[in-house]
Amino acid sequence: MAKPIKLITLLALLPATAAIAQNKWTERKAGDIAFVTNTGGQNLGYASTSGVKILTVDGFAFKDLNKNGKLDKYEDWRLPVDERAKDLASKMSVEQIAGLMLYSRHQPIPAAAGGPFAGTYNNKVFAESGAKASDLSDQQKQFLAKDNVRHVLVTSVQSPEIAAQWNNNAQAFVEGLGLGIPNNNSSDPRHGTVATAEYNAGAGGAISMWPGSLGLAATFDPEVVKNFGHIAAQEYRALGISTALSPQVDIATDPRWARVSGTFGEDPQLAADMARAYIDGFQTSAAEKEIKNGWGYNSVNAMVKHWPGGGAGEGGRDAHYAYGKYAVYPGSNFNQHLIPFTEGAFKLNGKTGMAAAVMPYYTISYNQDVKNHENVANNYNSYIINDLLRKKYKYDGVVCTDWLVTGDETTVDSFLSGKSWGVEGLSIAQRHYKVLMAGVDQFGGNNEVAPVTEAYQIGVKEHGEAFMRARFEQSAVRLLRNIFRTGLFENPYLEPEVSKQTVGKPEFMDAGYQAQLKSIVMLKNKANILPLQSGKTVYVPKKFTPAGRNFLGMETPEKLEYPVNMETVKKYFKVTDNPDEADYALIFIASPNSGGGYNSADAKNGGTGYVPVNLQYGTYTATDARATSIAGGDPLEKFTNRTYKGKSSTAINITDLAMVTDTYAKMKGKPVIVSVNMSNPMVFSEFEKDANAIFVDFGVQGQASLDIMTGKAEPSALLPLQMPIDMKTVEAQFEDVPHDMKCYVDENGNKYDFGFGLNWKGVIKDARVDKYVKSVVKP
């Protein structure tokens, strides 16, 4: 009887053998991660620790994310994204959707030992825990598992490999939970320059370094920006980041605003073109990296900000703070602020079509709600979001609040205070409900699910269960769409060694450096003193930085140091500490910084606290300011008039001016070259005549400035902002209107206006100038 048994066994095995033969997938393992190649289909990645198994259907491999043993629509990568997202949203509990609506607070990796972003590992600080830097903190496990958070804001990382390993640990952790929804990790911009870093052709770095947004704008070349987006997206994905909390496309219509440096300047058309290029670069995948419609494994969701434009804060004050909560429109120019969105971010050239997400600003767009006449922050304003963004401009992507908008206000001048402008009297749950009813999908910086589920119950009482369930699923579909399109449901895992080779690789470093060279504006070249001769002797004065506070309100220490890497300078020039021995002086300064327009000491001493934002170094007294502010009022203030008329302010870095004037005197007529790192427009009259040449940069390595000064590269950038003749014109200009200042004219007769710049031949007149520099008619 043995032979028939063998025959039966063999026959029983035949179907399985045939099925294996028909399989279109293969698998390889790298540690705990298995990578699956589907021939003619989407490739997969899953963690052996998550409990997820592979289903074979029609010969293809699929991940059984909810572990029910069958292929659900949302697990089927052959189906359209919207069909998958709707299927998954319908399966999610209210608590799970509420978690998807959260966006974590800032997460350094590893977690900090103290401060607002602190974390622990087995209840110990990292240094005492024995944990790896790539391990999940206790707090991360808590908000991922208990609060169902799937959108994590990653800040500092120790290295690309650690970032990749942390990503894999986080993805494996959530893959094993519930429906297996992956994390959509995000980042604020992280490609800025380190001024003292040295660029070596052919060498890699920690991450490619590019000029700041204003510097990208100063190229007046959208192709440079598109290339930045394309490269940055590859580096982001190698770090496990699939959403960029950028670009910032607000038009910088008030020169005093603290966030001017993050914009593409004051011109709506230039900002729109740069926004389009940036997002096309970030979101578009091509060739084998494309999944569908331009989306794929090199795509990073771009969250364009800040709708409907945050650059019109009264007096230039910023709405991270209660003292800057109002955006005002004395020029009736609200609509022009929408152009970078409607003509740029929502009208892409690439196949992805429009920005994946939008972030409204903290501001109350004062008296702009023509429907409900509400003066509440944009995140709460149904007219601003539902009527304008959603209905008029047909935007159906994710809308995510800026960070901490639902929190309680604690003080007028704290960066970490809640920013519930205009709805301070509502409970936290009521604020969440109002945000949802305004058309917003997601809460930035909120880790706790309870207020969202409370908001759901408020809605059920008001509109019924069916209405609120549909409203939640609507947001869930939008949020899931961005996770599906970037391939995260199929493979959210990285190979750390590949990440190490990708991030900061030589060709990326070179592209960033070339962009830096294209971003430096030459404003002055008296008697064609430039380019300087290499090998001459230079004097570089040390820069004094007084103690102060940064934009986040954190204390910064006093410093006296060289503002540029002197070892780099020595590769171009001989160096001396004695001006008498020098052929040239090279001075590196920063644009004036007088703070944000609020003085806490003034408030404590019985004043209102409001002072002018000063764009010159020396003391400025605001004799020409408005006697009565356009907007005002806060629960923590007993007055509504926020005027600063007659009050004074001095730049914190007034010593920069002294450095120029002192050096000019010490050089006794020998050439003085001034390089300004600019964050805001400034009044040049204080020192222009003491400089033979002036450069402006918006965040570059000092080496790039030296390459321009010595003629290794020719300056080609143009001013993306006007430079005011004085503070009187700053007070006279309207917060909401671009190109409306009298501009400074230097001793060579050149006007420092939008679009001005010099090359070795003189004033630049080219196709960029023809396209963007027009006579502007005031609205």
Residue ranges and their predicted role:
Residues M1-K24:
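Bacterial Sec-dependent N-terminal signal peptides
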Residues A21-P779:
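Glycoside hydrolase catalytic-domain context in secreted enzymes
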